[in-house]
C-alpha cells in the first residue's frame, strides 16, 4: 500500500489501523540536537484524543505516546524517531453488520475495489484514528519551527453546520470543546450539537489555520510551491473537501487593485495572498481555510449494497463524532507544521548562502 509517507527531507511514515494493536509513525530527517520528550508530543495528542466531551466520539483512548528510538539523553540524534500509540478501547463488535456491506460516504467501497480486502473494524486504515500519528509527528515539527524561527501555528473552528462562529480571540480556543475562538456563542453551539446528535445525523465544519513568524523564502516552484504543498497536506486529512489559501474563493469578486498586496518600506498593506506569492512564503502570516464534510457514520438508515451487489438498508452504530471537524484543529496544525519544516530544511539545503540587499519588510504587517 503506497501513499503512507509524507515529506522529502523531513519524512513521516505512519502505520496502524483503528482497531489494531496500535498506531504510530517513523520520522526521518529530524535535525539532531532538538530537546524532545514524550511530554512535548503528548500535549497535542491530548487536544486531539477522543472522549473529551459529549460532542465527540465516546471512544476512550489515552493516546499515550512512546518514543522508541531517535532520542538519547533527551535530545534527537538525527536518526529515525519511532513513535508508538497503543489502542486500548477498541469495540470491534460494533462493526459486525458492515463486514460484508459498504457504508455510504465511507472508504469501504473504494478500499474493497482497490485492494480486494479491507479491515472493516472502525474503517481500519482509512479511519481518522490514523491522524493521531500525524499529530505526534507534527508536534516534533512544531517544536523545531518554534525554536528555530519562533513560528506559532494555530487552528480554530469558524463554522459548524450552518452556525458561523465569530472570532473573539485565540485565548478562547482551549477553553471550549469546539476549538472556537469565541466565548459568547458556546451555549448556542452546545444546544446545536445536542440537537444534531439526537437527530441521528451529522454536520460538517470549517476551520482556519494560521502560521505566524514564517521566514520569507520557503517553497519550491514550480511544482512544489508552498501553497500547493499546503493544499496537498490539508486534502490528505480525512473528510477535508476544500482548501483556501489567503482570500481563497473570495478572490473571484475582488479587483486586482484590491487583491494585490501593496508594498511599502514599512511593510505590506494587506495579506490577501495568505502569506504566499509565487509559491514562496512572504514572511507574513500564512492563512488557510479548510472545509470538512459531515461525518459519514450516522445511525439514520440509508441505502447501500453488500459485497455481492445486493441492495440493503444500513445504519451505522457505534461511537462516532457527530461533527468530525471538532477534533480537526490539532491535525490541521500538524500538517501545516510538517509542510513548513520540510520546506525550511529544503531551503536551507539549497539556498542557505543566498543574501539580498532588499530590507526585510515582511513581518511588519500580518
Swiss-Prot record:
Which note does the record give on the cofactor?
Answer: Reduced FMN (FMNH(2)).
Q: Which cofactor does it need?
A: FMNH2
GO BP field: amino acid biosynthetic process; aromatic amino acid family biosynthetic process; chorismate biosynthetic process
Q: Which domain of life is it from?
A: Bacteria
Pathway info = Metabolic intermediate biosynthesis; chorismate biosynthesis; chorismate from D-erythrose 4-phosphate and phosphoenolpyruvate: step 7/7
- Which CDD domains does this chain map to? Chorismate_synthase (cd07304)
Reactions the enzyme catalyzes: 5-O-(1-carboxyvinyl)-3-phosphoshikimate = chorismate + phosphate
**EC number, as in UniProt:** 4.2.3.5
The record ties this protein, via Pfam families, to: Chorismate_synt (PF01264)
Keywords of the record, alphabetical order, are: Amino-acid biosynthesis, Aromatic amino acid biosynthesis, FAD, Flavoprotein, FMN, Lyase, NADP
Q: Where does FMN bind?
A: 125-127, 238-239, 278, 293-297, 319
Entry's Gene Ontology molecular function annotations: chorismate synthase activity; FMN binding
A Gene Ontology cellular component where this protein is annotated is: cytosol
Residues given in the record as NADP(+) binding sites = 48, 54
Quote the subunit structure annotation.
Homotetramer.
Give the UniProt family note.
Answer: Belongs to the chorismate synthase family.
Q: State the function annotated in the UniProt record.
A: This reaction introduces a second double bond into the aromatic ring system.
Identification of the protein by name: Chorismate synthase
Amino acid at each position: 500500500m503506497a501513499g503512507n509517507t509524507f515529506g522529502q527531507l523531513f519524512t513521516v511514515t505512519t502505520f496502524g489501523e483503528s482497531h489494531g494493536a496500535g498506531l504510530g509513525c517513523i520520522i526521518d530527517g529530524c535535525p539532531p540536537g532538538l530537546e524532545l520528550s514524550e511530554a512535548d508530543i503528548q500535549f497535542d495528542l491530548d487536544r486531539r484524543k477522543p472522549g473529551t466531551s459529549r460532542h465527540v466520539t465516546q471512544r476512550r483512548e489515552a493516546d499515550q505516546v512512546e518514543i522508541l528510538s531517535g532520542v538519547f539523553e533527551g535530545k534527537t540524534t538525527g536518526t529515525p524517531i519511532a513513535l508508538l500509540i497503543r489502542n486500548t478501547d477498541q469495540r470491534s463488535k460494533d462493526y459486525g453488520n458492515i463486514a460484508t456491506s459498504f457504508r455510504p460516504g465511507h472508504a469501504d467501497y473504494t478500499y474493497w475495489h482497490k485492494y480486494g480486502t479491507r479491515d472493516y473494524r472502525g474503517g481500519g486504515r482509512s479511519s481518522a484514528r490514523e491522524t493521531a500519528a500525524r499529530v505526534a509527528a507534527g508536534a516534533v515539527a512544531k517544536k523545531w519551527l518554534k525554536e528555530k524561527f519562533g513560528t506559532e501555528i494555530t487552528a480554530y473552528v469558524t463554522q459548524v453546520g450552518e452556525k458561523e462562529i465569530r472570532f473573539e480571540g485565540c485565548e478562547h480556543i482551549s477553553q471550549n470543546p469546539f476549538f472556537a475562538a469565541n466565548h459568547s456563542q458556546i451555549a448556542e453551539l452546545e444546544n446545536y450539537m445536542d440537537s444534531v446528535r439526537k437527530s441521528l445525523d451529522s454536520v460538517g465544519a470549517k476551520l482556519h489555520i494560521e502560521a505566524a513568524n514564517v521566514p520569507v523564502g520557503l517553497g519550491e516552484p514550480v511544482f512544489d510551491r508552498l501553497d500547493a504543498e499546503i493544499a496537498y497536506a490539508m486534502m490528505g486529512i480525512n473528510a477535508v473537501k476544500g482548501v483556501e489559501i489567503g482570500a481563497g474563493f473570495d478572490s473571484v469578486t475582488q479587483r486586482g487593485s484590491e487583491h494585490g498586496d501593496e508594498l511599502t518600506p514599512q511593510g505590506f498593506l494587506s495579506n490577501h495572498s495568505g502569506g504566499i506569492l509565487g509559491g514562496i512564503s512572504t514572511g507574513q502570516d500564512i492563512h488557510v481555510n479548510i472545509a470538512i464534510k459531515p461525518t459519514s457514520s450516522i445511525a439514520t438508515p440509508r441505502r447501500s449494497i453488500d459485497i455481492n451487489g445486493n441492495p440493503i438498508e444500513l445504519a451505522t452504530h457505534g461511537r462516532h463524532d457527530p461533527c468530525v471537524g471538532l477534533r480537526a484543529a490539532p491535525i490541521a496544525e500538524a500538517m501545516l507544521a510538517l509542510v513548513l519544516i520540510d520546506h525550511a530544511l529544503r531551503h536551507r539545503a539549497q539556498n542557505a548562502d543566498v543574501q539580498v540587499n532588499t530590507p526585510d519588510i515582511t513581518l511588519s504587517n500580518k
